[in-house]
Amino acid sequence: MKNQLRSSFSTQGRRMAGARALWVANGMKKEMMGKPIIAIVNSFTQFVPGHTHLHEIGQQVKAEIEKLGCFAAEFNTIAIDDGIAMGHDGMLYSLPSRDIIADSVEYMVNAHKADAMVCISNCDKITPGMLMAAMRLNIPTVFVSGGPMEAGEWNNQHLDLIDAMIKSADASVSDEDVAQIEDNACPGCGCCSGMFTANSMNCLNEAIGLGLPGNGTILATHANRTQLFKDAAALIVKNAYKYYEEGDDSVLPRSIATRDAFLNAMTLDIAMGGSTNTVLHLLAIAHEAEVDFKMDDIDMLSRHVPCLCKVAPNTQKYHIQDVNRAGGILNILGELSKGGLLKTDVKRVDGLTLAEAVEKYNICKKEVDTEAKRIYSSAPGNKFNIKLGSQNAVYKELDTDRANGCIRDLQHAYSKDGGLAVLKGNIAQDGCVVKTAGVDESIWKFSGPAKVFDSQDAACEGILGGKVVSGDVVVITHEGPKGGPGMQEMLYPTSYIKSKHLGKECALITDGRFSGGTSGLSIGHISPEAAAGGNIGKIVDGDIIEIDIPNRSINVKLSDEELAARPMAPVTRDRKVPKSLKAYASMVSSADKGGVRIID
């Protein structure tokens, strides 16, 4: 072999008799020794609907790999459900879990000297955590997500989790209606059905190049999702041999996830109005890959990439299943490439360049590829279902309408400015992020008095208690990576603002972050954060906050001298922080660096 198998340290030589005995006890056949050992990194848990259907698939992937002569071994990572952890101190653990996942994958794979990986991820911190590990390890890797949930339905309208949250806090909605919405919003397994963080990351993985076509959009319940796992099993064996036998390093994560690939992924995110959390995660993944990709790159892209796709929560018309029907991520990338907005010579895990992939999977050409038609015809089963790949409904026709359909061409873009913007100013000298795709253009310029809260809990009480009125800017401080610690998502405050019918009349700014389900004038990731001495921690009630999205600025109306002389506002909250999170806070950076741990 041109590259020595990592596993040879435990399978070769007389002195490794004990290790070989243990491999045999694990089910390895003698003829498998000396061949690649492939780790199956699963994230099954019954705490998270995005992962509850992954129990058996790891063993099915193992069986497919072993048919091809290699030994495969499965292990699990933790997985936190942000929706269940939200609204209480459980959310403090969500972002730190990303690093725990990355560490645990590195520990397991390096300790046992696995040669390659299939990563079975799905929800918010699991996909980025595994991607961070893949960049550290840099061994042949294929990602397959568990897939998106079908959209719910009630009163002939599509629903999702965010609808349940908003309606439950709206006094004009009856208890009976809330109960029915609650029962129908999440009809089974998969990650929540809009362009929230989980789906955003699984879609971006297709642009990064480590996810197969359909990774981000084929429904969890569809048979074609199961086929994707089979394809991944065959591909990882092929790529393992390409690297170790042939010395072909083009299959390695760092060869695929180059600077150009990160630029492509961010371009996609802006074009589809993805979650602002993707900014945090892409910065962290690039950090692990030792790729020079920073907030300034995101700012540059946001100024000229148009919005070509709007999905819930940015509209109620479309959910992820509709993106799939319109040709999925490769067809959004195809439209972007027509405008010269992508680097199409980048490599992909399937061996294609991006240019070759967007051509092969283009559903708008006269002769549609058979595989493309199979993938993008995958339709919802429209009934409650928690079993992976258990239905095979198909759309009668694909959505190829690029003027008025789910995916638009450049000439019919939703807006010439994309779905994300980076703002800077005296509140956020190192930047902050807003999902413009979810902001009504009438409030892209907004000015109002600050209503300051030093915790998410206090903000929720203030909003529900009527302390926030039309024209206010809600300011939530000390919720950044260090200050939280853990950088909580602010979905409940933004949902409560909507439930009070103030969605177009108020803004919210924070050094915390937002759920992918957030829309409205919600500005997060303010850096430096309050706990790192950032000026957001100096704002007091009544200060005038000026937000100007077109000019990419955010400022408090104070002179530099006034701001420099003003002390940090006192923190009045009573929050008990466990040692595990204190350790995290002692190492973590602000959001403009991806919230990564800074370790000398």
Swiss-Prot record:
Q: Which InterPro entries match?
A: Dihydro-acid_dehy_C (IPR042096), DihydroxyA_deHydtase (IPR004404), DiOHA_6PGluconate_deHydtase_CS (IPR020558), ILV_EDD_C (IPR056740), ILV_EDD_N (IPR000581), IlvD/EDD_N (IPR037237)
In what pathway does it function?
A: Amino-acid biosynthesis; L-isoleucine biosynthesis; L-isoleucine from 2-oxobutanoate: step 3/4; Amino-acid biosynthesis; L-valine biosynthesis; L-valine from pyruvate: step 3/4
Q: Which Pfam family is an annotated match for this chain, by its short name?
A: ILVD_EDD_N
The UniProt entry, under Gene3D superfamilies, shows: IlvD/EDD C-terminal domain-like
Listed binding positions for [2Fe-2S] cluster are: C123, C192
Cofactor(s) the record lists: [2Fe-2S] cluster; Mg(2+)
Q: Name one GO biological process term.
A: isoleucine biosynthetic process
Q: What EC number(s) is this enzyme filed under?
A: 4.2.1.9
User: Which reaction does this chain catalyze?
Assistant: (2R)-2,3-dihydroxy-3-methylbutanoate = 3-methyl-2-oxobutanoate + H2O; (2R,3R)-2,3-dihydroxy-3-methylpentanoate = (S)-3-methyl-2-oxopentanoate + H2O
Q: Name one GO molecular function term.
A: dihydroxy-acid dehydratase activity
Task: Please share the entry's free-text remark on the cofactor.
Answer: Binds 1 [2Fe-2S] cluster per subunit. This cluster acts as a Lewis acid cofactor.
Modified residue annotations for N6-carboxylysine: K125
- SS bonds (residue pairs): none
Q: Any idea which UniProt keywords this protein has? A: 2Fe-2S, Amino-acid biosynthesis, Branched-chain amino acid biosynthesis, Iron, Iron-sulfur, Lyase, Magnesium, Metal-binding
Assigned GO CC terms: cytosol
Binding residues annotated for Mg(2+), in chain numbering:
D82, D124, K125, E489
The record places the active site at S515
Q: Which HAMAP family match?
A: IlvD
Q: Which NCBIfam families match?
A: ilvD, PRK12448.1
**How would you summarize the oligomeric state and partners of this protein?**
Homodimer.
The family assignment reads: Belongs to the IlvD/Edd family.
Tell me the function of this protein: Functions in the biosynthesis of branched-chain amino acids. Catalyzes the dehydration of (2R,3R)-2,3-dihydroxy-3-methylpentanoate (2,3-dihydroxy-3-methylvalerate) into 2-oxo-3-methylpentanoate (2-oxo-3-methylvalerate) and of (2R)-2,3-dihydroxy-3-methylbutanoate (2,3-dihydroxyisovalerate) into 2-oxo-3-methylbutanoate (2-oxoisovalerate), the penultimate precursor to L-isoleucine and L-valine, respectively.
Which PANTHER family does the record associate with it? D-XYLONATE DEHYDRATASE, D-XYLONATE DEHYDRATASE YAGF-RELATED
Q: What is the protein's name according to its record?
A: Dihydroxy-acid dehydratase
What is the protein's species of origin? Phocaeicola vulgatus (strain ATCC 8482 / DSM 1447 / JCM 5826 / CCUG 4940 / NBRC 14291 / NCTC 11154)
Source lineage? Bacteria, Pseudomonadati, Bacteroidota, Bacteroidia, Bacteroidales
